[in-house]
Amino acid sequence: MASYPTFDLNSPRDLSGVYTQEQIDKMSDDDYKNALYSLWTNYCVSESYEPGSTFKPVTVASALEEGVVKDGDTYTCNGYEMIGPDRLKCHVYSSGGHGTITIEQAVMNSCNPYMIHLALELGNEKFAAYQSLFGFGKTTGIDLPGETMGIVYGNKMTTIDAACNSFGQTINVNMMQMMSAYCSIINGGMLYQPHIVKRIESANGEVVKENKATLVRQTVTMSTSKLLRRYLKSTVETGTAKKVAVTGYSVAGKTGTAQKSPRSENKWLISFIGHAPADNPKFAIYVIIDEPDGTTGTSGSSADVLTLSHDILEKLLPYMSVYKDSLEPETDTGTAEDEYTVDGVPEGSIQNTATENLQNMPSIN
């Protein structure tokens, strides 16, 4: 778990890594305090945000569980859906939509109209109930202070709320909620209370404290879990997340591009949530770049978070002794089409990652 910008624990009030001296000199006392609080805040648990398309696996899993969609079912995306007077667009709106696609292709290509269709078929009450089942709107119980609950509509959900929630807008979550929900979707349906430390041992090897895996509840069946793993694997192999692929390993996951409020400011939050190995998960990763501006040396678009996710996995998997697959897929090095291009936003990019070890999850072969 990490956030950037960060601070030196030996000099926690040093803002020089984030602000120029001129900016610091101009700060009022309140501005200075707020800058410190912002720097010290653990984004992964204490900040909530609209997740965007990384929420789509939750929508799809809920719909599969309720039987409102089956593997192979198709829906026609014309580039938008009308909810009353509101036109909710797909990211390929300008080209006329995705056409008739399967549910797997909807995940691979991040189709909004298909997700809206699923939410409407579920109905407001059931969709809200599944959000609660996956842990949204409540704390995860992680052993860190200051966890936010996020914001959900619950029994006040309207049709337009459900439609927007289906692709991760107008719902606020924290990173650990998303990570916990995602892990339950791909590990066979088991939602666990997350912990930072598994065990504390003394210098002579005695166990001082041990956090045993605590099962909270089951969210989905094994059959739904296997389908989502397949869909998410396809998303990395041939869908919107091709840039995350790591040579020699099977990786699965979902991209996200969320427009921040107020919408008129045209600011974005881009993300990737995924796991490896794809068919037998050992690790999950969640990476966010808040308001990308290209200062990482790339484009300031959703490609940035995919490159960062790839780089993390490329180092993480061999370091944690995860064996390569027998067949090594080719890593996509071309320019994959982004869900959105997000250029020209102000400075202040924040990169956040949350990674969870799934070694103690039940076998899901």
Task: Enumerate the language-model features and the residues they cover.
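A short acidic/glycine-rich loop-to-helix N-cap element
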Residues: 291-304
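Short, gly/Ser/Thr-rich active-site loops of penicillin-recognizing serine hydrolases
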Residues: 207-209, 303-365
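Intrinsically disordered, low-complexity acidic/polar segments
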Residues: 282, 294-296, 319
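Beta-lactam-recognizing serine transpeptidase/beta-lactamase-like catalytic domain environment
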Residues: 1-53, 58-289, 355-365
